[in-house]
Curated annotation (Swiss-Prot):
Species whose genome carries this gene: Nitrosospira multiformis (strain ATCC 25196 / NCIMB 11849 / C 71)
Keyword Transmembrane helix: no
GO molecular function, one term: 2 iron, 2 sulfur cluster binding
Oligomer and partners: Homodimer.
Protein name: Putative iron-sulfur cluster insertion protein ErpA
Signal peptide: none
Cofactor(s) essential for the protein: iron-sulfur cluster
Length: 127
């Protein structure tokens, strides 16, 4: 399907006036770009996925991928492509993918309003 989605602005799609379903922040896109530059492979894209497991039933995952699958939703922000497979996308609708650095460390964070509960570390959730 390779459907484009939110530009990360948190705004509505001007063509449909429907809220954008996924937000990819500037902080996250810029950090991914840094990591891709460190790897020296401009074909890399960030894949975000949901898998069974974790203390709350589902867990988030991040990996680099060179290939775009037929059922992926593809988003580009600041020159970085984000991939989400169709199954994972249904659990990530309305979520924000961000990167934060603080006194506790640095990490990618998913703020998911569709999650009924999350674990303390924020890496797993339930619906």
């Amino acid at each position: 399907m390779n459907t484009p989605f939110n530009d990360g602005s948190g705004q509505t799609d001007p063509m449909t006036d429907i809220p954008t379903p996924l937000i990819f922040t500037d902080n996250a896109a810029n950090k991914v770009r840094e990591l891709i530059e460190e790897e020296g492979n401009n074909d890399l894209k960030l894949r975000v996925f949901v898998a069974g497991g974790g203390c709350s039933g589902f867990k988030y995952g991040f990996t680099f991928d060179e290939l775009i699958s037929e059922d992926d939703t593809v988003m580009e922000k600041n020159g970085v492509k984000l991939l989400v497979d169709a199954m994972s996308f249904q659990y990530l609708a309305g979520a924000e993918i961000d990167y934060q650095e603080n006194a506790e460390g640095a990490q990618f964070i998913i703020k998911n309003p569709g999650a009924a509960s999350t674990c303390g570390c924020g890496s797993s959730f339930s619906v």
